[in-house]
Amino acid sequence: TLTISGTLDGDLNNIVRGYIAAGNEIDNATVVVESGGVIQGKSNAIMGRETSGLTVTNSGTIEATSSKAIQLQDSQNATITNKSGGLIFADTNAIVQQSVGTEDATGASITNAGTIYSVENRAIYFYDGATDATFTNESGGIIYNTSTFATVQIDTNSTLVNSGTIDNRNSPSNAGIAIVGNNNTITLKDKSILVGKIDGGSTTGNTLKFQHGVGQGYYYETEGSFTLQDLDGNQVVKGSAGSVGQGGNETLD
């Protein structure tokens, strides 16, 4: 366990490193950044490549001045918790996972009650075989970016639940959530905010669930094919998903 209560920084890559070389990783490591603590580096402020069971709990700041505040390439079962007041950010792609080697990139869990953001790219970027991930943006949690890229991108067989804010601050015509793999489930809870499209591209087997309360109106611009479910029994139409408050029977033309 590494606990940071002060500042650990430098104009370097891999400030906290769980990966040395292939076959030489630190599994089941825990990194705790306390309130006021800072990990700051150039790229890969926390390098979790090829690790298993990495746990990061942040109440302070994890920052990459270039790319990847947290790098999860080829990692398994990582747990990232960004608590209220916590900040995770990078100039490009704040939290990243992909599969590029012989190990799977799978089972990551990201829970956010603080702020995660990227300036030039995506705040959360899962792609190229990153599977079975769970993303939970809690009430009060903010995930945003200021570029034309999607704010959050997920890959395959993953779950995203938004009770907070996901915000593409460049333009609402960009993707707030992008999906590049199949068989994912996205749930948008009451009082959650999504600025940007939900873009499923040519993927299949994806489900959008809405839980805004009986009789509540909402509208989300979507691209691609989705199964739509309103968990409160309201009627929801396909295309761009929406429901206009009309009691228990709701439609949007």
Annotate each language-model stretch with its function.
Residues 1-253:
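Long, low-complexity, polar and repeat-rich extracellular regions
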